[in-house]
Each structure stands twice: as structure tokens, then as C-alpha cells.
Amino acid sequence: MTSEQAGSRQLKHDDDAEHKSPQQTTKWRNNAHSAARGRSCVRAATDLRFSTTKSSSEQNSPTCRAGLQASGTLLRLSSVGDVGGYARRRQGRATVVPDVKVRKMRLAGAGLTFISQSAVPEVRAAPVAKARNAALDRTRTFLTLVVLFHHAVIPYTYFGHTDPKSFVGFDMVVLATDSFFMAMFFLLSGLFVWPGLVRKGPRHYLLDRVLRLGLPFAIGALTIIPVAYYALSLRQQPEVGFADFWWKTVTVGPWPSGPIWFLWVLFGLDVIASLVYVISPKALDPINHLSLQAREQPAKFVLVMFAVTAVLYIPGRIYFGAGNWFEFGPFSVQHGRVLLYACYFFFGAGIGVANLNGGLLAADGRLAKGNWIWIPTVLIPYCCMWGLVYIKREILENPVQLPHWYEGIYGFFFAWFSMAIVFGILAFFLRFERAGRSILDAMQPDAFGMFLIHYPIVLWLQYWMFDLELPAIAKALIAFGLTVLLSWGATILLRKIPGAKHVL
């Protein structure tokens, strides 16, 4: 419309107003002024300078809401006129989607639609359900199955077997699994630490961890673990009853913790992370920035993490050795791996500080697209570790105390292999995140419970098969298959107990 046309229309409206009653004239002029103010708000909302160009009263006016509706940019206006609310920036634009149907009214002569305040006093954003990360869920469930398989084959390894039957292939499995799976659990656990601290605060976060980690550890140490190790005791002292064995375990010792040592170590790292968060909430931002860059350059992140883990792990292995454990009652952990686990945990926490799905672990990132490169990256250090095992057994004659040079070289390849296979597994599951349904999806809610209760099941199955004339492979597969089914079924039943889902 030209300025001349606008002036003619205004004169016509003024002439019409002369023939109206004073009340009609006032109403007409209010509508005209409202239309002008609405158009002003349209322009302000379009260039996203709304909060600075309009006063609080103007921002809350129905006509400004009309301007926002007409411009296609709908913002939630709070009672004090602030436009923060549910507006969120996505690629430089503020967007929000209303979750209510509203009654529309049309301004006479203005051609603008606005939201009636009598119909809806405030536009609310639809709550967005937190979507689970299928790739990480499947990775965690897969790792749980790796733990079960690891424990199912240990008695049937060629070196150090406890069953009459053995198979050297299981030594190859155990060498690989023992080198990475617990470190990877700490990495995955760390991913969600910072979001939990931000959402709940350190106090409530730690209370939640006491429920999720401390309570299962206490119950497991007093019940699950003694039941599991009683199967081993019967082979050596069949005359000892379970009550006597249990009492001796918890009073005199030794009191092994089995695989649940992971729970108390993880809780300890959660406590440290909470203290770090209180002191400096941005302490892990450098790791997060590195993760965001790793969306396109994952090699940089992997190399930095490898360098840090190697520096922290190798000295501990040289000083303590590979088989030295800290033990205090049911609290136990390998001395030489404490810093390795802490490193994985805090790197995971750094990745999860912000944009978890937009950095290193992005489903469309470079890590997810480079699966094949991980095969040689994993095989090279693994073969070198086997070469060192040969040197230890055939040349050094398997000494109790290995020379420092040996531990240092082995520690280097151990850190390399652990890093490579962890990110290789992550790359695989990220690549096939959308590849339909998987049995891992069905197992995912019960994976933690399976981890907690599988140990007595697998040890008692091995006890009952000890005297059977079956090949080692058959025994291991039977033990693994039944352990998966029985621990899964038991977890499903236990989770039906009121309140159990908060723990299992």
C-alpha cells in the first residue's frame, strides 16, 4: 500500500468516525492503535530484538501477542514481560511450539489475529520427553554380556584353568576382555555425571548414587558374593556348611567382592566428581571442547586420551605390578588400574558436559563412519601383547616379579589396545544406531541387574559341570547361555518388587 492510499484510507476512517457515537469512536480508535502496535511487535519479533525494543507492558499486550503470531515467531511471555521462557535458539533462530489450542479473535479493520487472554492466559511449551541414546544403551548391554562371557570361560582357559577341560582360545578371549571392559564401563558411566549434577545438584545426586550403587554393593557383598564363592569353597572344603562359610567370610576373611567392586569404585569417583563440580563447574570444559572438535576429528581426541591414560597407567603398573590388589573387607581394586579407571571416567564426564550427541559420539560424526580403521588399530597392540606373553612364559620363564622394562612395554600396548577397542565398539554401535530392533534393546532395562546377580549363577553352573565329560567349549557355552537366561529372568522378577526398579 502506498502512502497516498494509506492517507486516503485514514481520512475515510476519520469521516466514518464523525458519524459514530463517542463510545463507537473510542472503540474504533483503540483498535486502530492496537493494530499499529501489533505491527510494531511483528517487526521487533522478526529481528529477535523484542525484549530490548518494547516495554514490559507492551510485551504483555494482546496485540503484541498478535504480532508474534502473525510473524510466525511465537514466544512465551512471562508475567513480568520477559521473553526468555521457552524460546530456544536453534541455528541462530528462536523457536517454540505451543502445546495448547487457543481461541482466536480478529481485530476489526486490522486484519491481525491475536490470542485471547481469557481463553489462554499463557502459552506453555510442550514438555519434550528425554530420548534415550540407543547406541549407548546397546553398548552398555553388550558390555554386560561381555562380562558374563568373560566369567563363563575363565575356568576353561589353558593357563590357570580350574576345570579339567581347557581351550587356549579362551585365553585369547580373556586377554582381550580383561584389558578393556571395566575401563569402558567407567567411560560410559562418566558420560552422565555432569548432567546429573547440573539437574539434581551435588547433594541429591550423591544421595541417588547411594541408592543406585551403595545399596546394591552392601546387599551384594553380604549375600550375592558369599553365595557365589561358596561354590568354590565346596571344592576345597566340602564339609564346611554355608552358615560357617558366610560367618568366616564377613568376620575373618578373605571377603572378596567379585565383580561388584566396580560399584564402590564408581561411587568414589562420583564423590570426587561432585567435589570438582562444586569447586569448579567448568573444570571439564576443555575435554568437552575437544569432544566437540572430535565430531570431525576423532583421531585428535583419541590420541590425547591415549597419551593421558598411558602416562597415568604405566607408572602404576611398573610400581604395583599387574596382579596387586588393594583389599579392605569387601572393598577391593587393582592398584595399578585405579588411575586408568579414573581417567576413563573423567574423560567420559567431559564428553557429557554438554552436547553429548553433537560431538565425538554424534551418530553422523566421523567416529561412526570410520569402522574399518579400528580393525588394524585394535589388532596391532593385541598381537604385541601376545608377543610379550610369549616372552614372559618362554624366555623369562614366568617369574613372579617381572622386570620394569617388561611392565612398561606391556602397559603401553595395554593402554593402546584398551583405547582402540573401546572406541571401535562405540563406532560400531553409533554406525548402526538406527538399524532396527535388537535383542539388546529388550535386555537393556535389565542389564544392570544381570551384572549384579550373574556371578553366583555362573559359578554354581561351573561347579555342577566340573565332573562332566564335556569339551571346554561346550561347558563354556552352556555356562554362558544359562547364565544369560537365568540372570535375565531373575532380574525381571526382582524388578517387579515395589521400589526395586529404582535400584536394579
Summary of predicted features, one role per range:
Residues R103-R106, G111-L504:
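Alpha-helical transmembrane segments and their immediate juxtamembrane cytosolic regions
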Residues G7, G38, G67, G72, ...:
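Residue-identity detector for glycine
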Residues E4, R49-F50, S55:
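Polybasic, low-complexity intrinsically disordered segments
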Residues Q5, Q10-H13, H19, Q23-Q24, ...:
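Low-complexity, intrinsically disordered or signal/transmembrane-proximal segments
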